[in-house]
């Protein structure tokens, strides 16, 4: 296995864990900050919107940056956002920090997939992309339950420290293992969005959006939905998330 791809996958694991782990600590966040669960759930909304909306913008406007520099900058912003969340005294600070973390994720993820493809010969690019994306997939299976379990041992802030640590480890791995990767040929935002004019592409993306929106709307509030079954025990919830 190419260690360079594993370094990129580690960063994707951190980004994915941050996307999903809030589901396991949402009731704790709401109780700690004296807000409703629905308000605390905006942590997921702000992170997801920041991540989704800024990704194509950054990919277009930062295309002239060397890839490795952009990867490290993205992980630095991502870690900073999670550290602020871990220290945040109010819900306002939490939401602000989630935006920052989403910005870092938006800087990192598209760059990581493009870099993974650039590191592999043409006949192995699909395999390289699969390795990088596996970091994101494994975050659902392992990162989120583990982060929730860590939160159950202390408080929800420990979970954010865990995510920050994973992001920091990924940054060190990228710094040590990745070679310098030249900036890829630039494409304007209009060029990047041009495929959406094809109704087949647009419909496929809308279907994917609807499916994931429905799935993660349920997943985000899993801690509340299963509160009676888990007896409010976060470690039991972490086990359910692992099974899911």
Regions found by a protein language model. Give the residues of each.
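MFS-fold secondary transporters
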Residues: 81-86, 101, 117, 174
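C-terminal membrane-cytosol helix-exit motif in multi-pass small-molecule transporters
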Residues: 164-184
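Juxtamembrane intracellular "pre-TM" segments in multi-pass secondary transporters
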Residues: 178-207
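Conserved MFS/SLC helix-loop-helix module at the cytosolic interface between two early adjacent transmembrane helices
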Residues: 53-92
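Extracytoplasmic
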Residues: 4-37, 55-58, 218-223
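Interfacial helix-cap and linker-helix signal at transmembrane-aqueous boundaries
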Residues: 29-30, 61-62, 146-154, 226-227
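Residue-level signature of mid-helix packing/kink "hotspots" within the transmembrane helices
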Residues: 20, 48-56, 140-141
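Cytoplasmic helix-loop-helix junction between adjacent transmembrane helices
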Residues: 91, 97-136
């Amino acid at each position: 296995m190419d260690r360079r791809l594993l370094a990129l996958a580690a960063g994707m694991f951190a980004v994915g864990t941050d996307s999903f782990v809030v589901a396991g600590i949402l009731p704790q966040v709401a109780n700690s900050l004296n807000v409703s669960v629905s308000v605390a759930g905006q942590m997921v909304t702000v992170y997801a919107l920041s991540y989704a909306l800024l990704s194509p913008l950054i990919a277009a406007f930062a295309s002239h940056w060397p890839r490795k520099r952009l990867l490290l900058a993205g992980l630095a912003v991502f870690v900073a956002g999670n550290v602020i969340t871990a220290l945040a005294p109010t819900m306002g600070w939490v939401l602000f920090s989630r935006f920052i973390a989403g910005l870092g994720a938006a800087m990192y993820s598209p760059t990581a997939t493009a870099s993974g493809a650039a590191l592999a010969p043409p006949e192995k690019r699909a395999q390289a992309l699969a390795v990088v994306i596996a970091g994101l997939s494994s975050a659902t299976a392992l990162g989120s339950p583990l982060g929730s379990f860590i939160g159950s041992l202390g408080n929800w802030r420990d979970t954010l420290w865990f995510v920050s640590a994973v992001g920091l480890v990924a940054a060190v791995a990228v710094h040590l293992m990745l070679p310098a990767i030249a900036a890829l040929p630039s494409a304007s935002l209009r060029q990047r969005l041009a495929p959406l004019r094809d109704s087949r592409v647009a419909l496929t993306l809308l279907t994917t959006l609807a499916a994931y929106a429905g799935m993660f709307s349920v997943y985000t509030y899993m801690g509340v939905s299963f509160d009676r079954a888990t007896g409010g025990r976060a470690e039991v919830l972490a086990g359910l998330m692992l099974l899911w």
